[in-house]
């Protein structure tokens, strides 16, 4: 299997070319994903209400909390598959796919049930504005009921990513995006279901993308065919996936809890401020997508080359990726800060929402370059099998620094000051990751296996 089938062997050839060509489909897919998320926000902000806009924004960290654990396990699968593929052990690749899907099928019902039961308690913790309570609850219940599609898509993407294939994932996302936009227009504008229509559109689109992904992989790559209900579960191999992926999943879960802690404070300032925060968050996420895509590429690149015992290529690839991430982040941050007001106006005509969004961007975007360096280095270490240190680093920066400083600054200087806490957390975490990577402490995590 070679690049003609979408699968890329990154242990030979130009590291820059491999990373770039792997990143581009991921980037296009991430833009598509954010595009349909922004269509959701545009539709509800302009044709439903600010309460619906706040509901969609509040929903993200809650849904992320429930999907993050399995997303982390999928990342572990990506690393194990990449290392096996780079070392030419295709039987191990096959076993990893079977084990991942067997675990997914066994756990999806308990995850969904837990999510549905926790919707009301989490909304209480988040201090959701009473004016937006009903719409937020509706949105969360529907999206939580459809978690299978979101988690399943991430699993398919992780499997293909380990073998250097990001172009097929773009196809899955294209299907989801087109369908989601159509359903938004149909269920909100044509059939006025409000926030319920937005939630239904999201769930149906994700479910179709996941099922289409299984069909496509089984047809295109029969040697990698997914058997959701009759795969052979390799307990020892799955434990290795868990060793690498569980810290990443725990990190994502705790970061989601940290995000909910932030939202709890944000929600205390009212519906307009919450809507503005959510608009700003969407815009900063959009500008960060290239770095996110580069980080995903470096996981697969490092994994394959560690499997092939090419540490020289690992270091070369990481240097290239960090440089690309820094250049992009500096340019995009300057652009977003410069156009913060007109960009915010796209999503809401309310002056209070626009002002809150613009202020968020003006405070959060300047130190984003620190987060870019942190993100790429942590991803590189995960690709080498060292996922515990990145977890401790990021969780400490969010839970021990960002959230406490956010409350402290907001209470002392007002709501806008809370955003300074982002830069504080990123600066400390970035410095620690640079030290850990430069010291080479991540290398033994693979060699000892």
What is each PLM-predicted segment?
Residues 20, 24, 36, 73, ...:
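Residue-level signal for transmembrane alpha-helical positions in Major Facilitator Superfamily
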Residues 21-40, 142, 153, 176, ...:
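Transmembrane helical elements of multi-pass membrane transporters/channels
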Residues 31, 35-53, 123-130, 186-193, ...:
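Helix-terminus/linker motif at the lipid-water interface of multi-pass membrane proteins
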Residues 74, 142-161, 169-177, 198-211, ...:
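Short runs within selected transmembrane alpha-helices of multi-pass transporters and secretion channels
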């Amino acid at each position: 299997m070679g690049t003609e089938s979408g699968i890329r062997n990154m242990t030979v050839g130009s590291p820059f070319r491999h990373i770039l060509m792997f990143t581009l489909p991921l980037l296009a897919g991430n833009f598509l994903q954010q595009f349909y998320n922004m269509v959701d926000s545009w539709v509800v902000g302009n044709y439903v209400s600010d309460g619906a806009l706040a509901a969609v924004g509040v929903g993200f960290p809650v849904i992320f909390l429930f999907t993050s654990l399995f997303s982390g396990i999928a990342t572990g699968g990506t690393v194990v598959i990449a290392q096996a593929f780079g070392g030419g052990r295709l039987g191990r690749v096959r076993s990893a796919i079977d084990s991942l899907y067997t675990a997914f099928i066994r756990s999806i019902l308990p995850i969904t049930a837990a999510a549905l039961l926790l919707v009301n308690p989490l909304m209480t913790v988040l201090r959701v504005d009473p004016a937006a309570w009903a719409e937020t609850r509706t949105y969360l219940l529907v999206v939580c009921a459809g978690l299978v599609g979101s988690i399943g898509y991430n699993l398919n993407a992780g499997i293909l990513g380990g073998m250097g294939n990001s172009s097929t994932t773009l196809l899955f996302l294209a299907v989801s995006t087109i369908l989601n936009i159509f359903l938004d227009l149909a269920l909100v504008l044509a059939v006025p279901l409000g926030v319920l229509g937005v939630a239904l559109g999201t769930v149906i689109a994700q479910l179709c993308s996941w099922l289409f992904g299984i069909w496509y992989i089984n047809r295109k790559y029969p040697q990698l065919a997914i058997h959701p209900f009759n795969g052979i579960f390799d307990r020892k191999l799955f434990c290795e996936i868990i060793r690498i992926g569980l810290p990443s999943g725990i990190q994502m879960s705790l970061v989601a809890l940290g995000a909910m802690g932030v939202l709890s404070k944000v929600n205390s300032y009212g519906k307009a401020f919450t809507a503005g925060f959510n608009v700003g968050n969407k815009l900063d996420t959009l500008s960060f997508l290239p770095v996110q895509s580069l980080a995903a590429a470096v996981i697969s690149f490092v994994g394959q080359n560690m499997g092939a015992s090419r540490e020289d290529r690992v270091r070369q690839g990481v240097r290239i990726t960090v440089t690309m991430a820094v250049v992009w982040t500096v340019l995009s941050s300057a652009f977003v800060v410069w156009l913060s007001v007109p960009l915010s106006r796209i999503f809401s005509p309310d002056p209070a929402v626009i002002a809150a969004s613009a202020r968020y961007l003006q405070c959060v975007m300047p130190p984003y370059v620190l987060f870019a360096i942190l993100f790429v280095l942590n991803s590189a270490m995960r690709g080498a099998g060292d996922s515990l240190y990145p977890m401790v680093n990021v969780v400490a920066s969010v839970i021990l620094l960002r959230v406490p400083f956010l409350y402290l600054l907001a209470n002392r200087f007002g709501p806008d000051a809370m955003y300074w806490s982002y830069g504080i957390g990123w600066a400390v975490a970035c410095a620690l990751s640079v030290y850990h990577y430069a010291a080479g402490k991540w290398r033994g995590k693979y060699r000892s296996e």
